[in-house]
Design a protein with these regions (language model features):
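Glycine- and aromatic-enriched mobile tails/lids
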Residues: 1-125
Length: 125
């Protein structure tokens, strides 16, 4: 069953415009990350998801959230490589990746069902 799911997922990805960032070699060191910066980035993720990816969504808002989160993802990736691994830093890295996955899924799902409601007609999506 896992094999079938992997084949299905791969066929879906092939036709999309998803361009994952290049994976660079690990260059982490022992500097301790500033937890205030981590908290600020977590707050930015929360605000972005609340304001642009809430219950009522539009293509335009989802694109804006995607762009903001992609930029933050690159910054967090650099931050992750420059500092010692810690639980708050891992939580931040996971949060931005999860937020991006939610945005991508919401953007590609144009059908309004359940608590996913697309209101593209008013904003021109």
């Amino acid at each position: 069953m896992a094999r079938e799911a992997a084949i299905s997922a791969a066929s879906e990805i092939t036709g999309s415009q998803f361009n994952p960032p290049e994976v660079r070699p690990w260059e982490g060191n022992r500097l301790q990350a500033d937890e205030d910066l981590i908290q600020q980035d977590l707050n930015l993720i929360k605000a972005t998801m609340w304001n642009y990816v809430g219950l009522v969504r539009t293509g335009r808002r989802l694109q804006r959230a995607r762009d903001m989160l992609r930029e933050l993802h690159m910054q967090v990736d650099d931050f992750y490589r420059d500092y010692a691994v810690s639980k708050p830093l891992l939580n931040l890295r996971n949060a931005v990746q999860t937020a991006l996955l939610v945005v991508y899924a919401a953007y590609h799902n144009t059908t309004s069902v359940g608590c996913h409601y697309r209101n593209d007609s008013r904003e021109g999506g």
